[in-house]
């Protein structure tokens, strides 16, 4: 995941363990491969949009079976036409923020409605989460999030350097 993201891939969906649902569903109905069946606690699924100029999605499903053998299923989905704007899920952003200790979003422009709504939804998943915002438009993003109902006490400016928007949990 981190290697693909370092190459510019955008993480759209990420689940682990029981959050992914039934491994039987993934193995048999989605991927059509019974060898991917195993304990739900030992599974992970990622969906990424590959970096431009590719208009492709990459799906990765990994599981460690009861016999301790690890399996990884990878599918690249190449689009026949340019893909529309695709945003990650709020749960994916929260999982990434917790795991990596920060979110670096390539949001170089002023706030837009779609991303503002997504970030508000992400913050609603954890009402105790406080964030530090940094980046060239961090102040504008903080204002946009506050206008959509996020309490000012949950958002703190940490600088205007750097491209995009960086979010870091505050303790």
Which residues fall in each region the model found?
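A glycine-rich helix N-cap at a beta->alpha junction
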Residues: 152-156
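Short glycine-rich, basic-tinged beta-strand/loop micro-motifs
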Residues: 125-135
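An acidic-aromatic pocket/loop used at catalytic or ligand-binding sites
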Residues: 1-125, 139-148, 159-171
């Amino acid at each position: 995941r981190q290697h693909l993201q370092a190459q510019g891939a955008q993480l759209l969906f990420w689940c682990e363990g029981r959050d992914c649902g039934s491994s039987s569903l993934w193995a048999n109905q989605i991927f059509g491969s019974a060898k991917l069946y195993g304990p739900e606690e030992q599974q992970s699924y990622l969906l990424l949009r590959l970096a431009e100029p590719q208009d492709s999605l990459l799906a990765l499903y990994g599981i460690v079976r009861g016999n301790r053998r690890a399996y990884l299923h990878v599918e690249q989905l190449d689009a026949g036409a340019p893909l529309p704007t695709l945003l990650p899920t709020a749960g994916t952003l929260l999982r990434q923020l917790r795991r990596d200790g920060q979110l670096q979003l390539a949001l170089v422009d002023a706030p837009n409605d779609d991303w503002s709504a997504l970030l508000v939804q992400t913050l609603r998943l954890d009402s105790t989460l406080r964030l530090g915002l940094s980046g060239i438009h961090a102040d504008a993003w903080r204002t946009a999030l506050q206008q959509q109902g996020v309490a000012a006490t949950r958002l703190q400016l940490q600088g205007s350097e750097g491209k995009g928007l960086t979010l870091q949990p505050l303790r």
